[in-house]
Amino acid sequence: MCRDMLPQDIFDYDPKNLWDYYYKDGIYYIDHHQSHATYAFLNSNFEQSDILAIDGIGSKYRCVFFDKDQNLIDLSDELPIGWLWNHMSNLTGFGTLGASKLMGKVGYGKYSEYYYNIFETILNGPITEKKQKHFQHIKLDNIDNLAHTLQKFTIDKIKEYVYPLKTCDNLC
């Protein structure tokens, strides 16, 4: 396995800044979310920006925020939105890594208070990588509405947790 071939201290790498990196014995490494954030920033053409990277998995994080000075703030516990999208895409038949397919349904649905409350309840519970057995009790009578509501939920959570951290007008 690839993990066995890498130096063990690479797994202890803990970036504090957007441009931090691990380098040893010819191995260059940056964190998965750091990579997403860097790509977003470099392609934004902003000279300065806050950056948000949300994803379902990564070696260390689920969600990170970089302020305008490029300092990393770990929001993995507060905002595991990518994790929720992954689990909902699996539940709706799009597969564990099919969140983009579920996102494609957003424009076809309507807001559902039922789904919104479900998402609130889920994020108030344990966030684990294992399949959540209680998810099977979620009614899937309208996947379009689930997707639409999950997008609204995502935006609301970003406003709740990320907007207070903003240090400039730009956000990647």
Language model regions located:
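Conserved active-site and cofactor/substrate-binding residues in soluble primary-metabolism enzymes
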Residues: 32, 79-83, 149, 153-157
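Conserved catalytic cysteine-centered active-site region
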Residues: 12-31
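Conserved phosphate-binding catalytic cores of ATP/NTP-utilizing and phosphoryl-transfer enzymes
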Residues: 28-52
